[in-house]
Amino acid sequence: MFAVIKTGGRQYRVVPDDVLEIGKIAGDVGTIIQLGEVLMLGGDTPVLGLPTVAGATVAAEVLQHKRGPKVISFKKRRRKNSKRKRGYRDEITVLRITEILADGKAPSIGPRPPREKKPVVETSAEADDAAA
């Protein structure tokens, strides 16, 4: 089963366990969010929404928030000694699609426990520097 969802003005075709990079949305890392604008459900019997499918949502887990690649906008006017350079980086949220839900069902998968960070082990060179 697949779904076509709309978020941030763009449309995505998703199946469970897909990983998406979309424009930044609210939600802490590890939480499950629901994307409600489902335009189409596909599978054995496809359902088209007018404009959205009633009662259908897509559950997704927030994997991380990050910044996209730098985009540079450079404009130059020849022979005028005039140029303008600007750059920006988009804020991105990385999602993993967990479930495609129809008929107003609630997601069955809860949020995953946060990852434990590995303890930092001091090397002998760092310990010698600290002792000196």
Curated annotation (Swiss-Prot):
Keyword terms: Ribonucleoprotein, Ribosomal protein, RNA-binding, rRNA-binding
Entry keyword Ribonucleoprotein: yes
Any one GO CC term of the record: ribonucleoprotein complex
Region of interest (Disordered), ranges: 104-132
Pfam families: Ribosomal_L21p
GO BP of this protein: translation
GO molecular-function term, one example from the UniProt record: structural constituent of ribosome
Job description of the protein: This protein binds to 23S rRNA in the presence of protein L20.
Record note on quaternary structure: Part of the 50S ribosomal subunit. Contacts protein L20.
Family statement drawn from the similarity comment of this UniProt entry: Belongs to the bacterial ribosomal protein bL21 family.
Protein name: Large ribosomal subunit protein bL21
UniProt gene name: rplU
